[in-house]
Amino acid sequence: MLQPKRRKYRKEQKGRNTGVATRGNAVSFGEYGLKAIGRGRLTARQIEAARRAMTRHIKRGGRIWIRIFPDKPISQKPAEVRMGNGKGNPEYYVAEIQPGKMLYEMDGVSEELAREAFRLAAAKLPLKTTFMVRQLGA
């Protein structure tokens, strides 16, 4: 699963996920892309589950790019622990997703195969997504 190799600080504040994606919002590497319409967080496990679903569907043909990386640590306190005594330990990492962010890209397969693979991947994700085709000159 994806996670940072090392961080300057182990824990991070919650913050707010606002605005729309102004970078990473176009199909750059492949021919087809899966773009987020909704806003939210994707855990490293969700990103990996969607990648596996796509990889299994396209079998050996084609290439997949993951355009997001889970770099925000989410901390949790253990079950049945009283409040106070500091912040909990980092449990998992998430990628914060704004509307318009390109999540995955694919190349080397037909459009029908790419659509179906992205449909299977989108079922694993808690966001609304849409299928994108690379624009000429982009």
UniProtKB/Swiss-Prot annotation:
GO BP: translation
Q: Which Gene3D superfamilies match?
A: Ribosomal protein L10e/L16
Highest taxon above the source species: Bacteria
Q: Which UniProt keywords apply?
A: Ribonucleoprotein, Ribosomal protein, RNA-binding, rRNA-binding, tRNA-binding
A GO term for molecular function: structural constituent of ribosome
Quick one: where's region Disordered? 1-22
Compositional bias, Basic residues, is annotated for 1-13
Q: CDD domains, alphabetically?
A: Ribosomal_L16_L10e
- Kindly give the InterPro entries that the UniProt entry links to this protein: Ribosomal_uL16, Ribosomal_uL16_bact-type, Ribosomal_uL16_CS, Ribosomal_uL16_dom, Ribosomal_uL16_sf
Q: What SUPFAM superfamilies does this protein map onto?
A: Ribosomal protein L16p/L10e
Q: Which GO terms describe its cellular component?
A: cytosolic large ribosomal subunit
Q: What does this protein do?
A: Binds 23S rRNA and is also seen to make contacts with the A and possibly P site tRNAs.
Q: Subunit structure, briefly? A: Part of the 50S ribosomal subunit.
Family according to the record: Belongs to the universal ribosomal protein uL16 family.
Name of protein: Large ribosomal subunit protein uL16
Q: What organism does the record attribute this protein to?
A: Paraburkholderia phymatum (strain DSM 17167 / CIP 108236 / LMG 21445 / STM815)
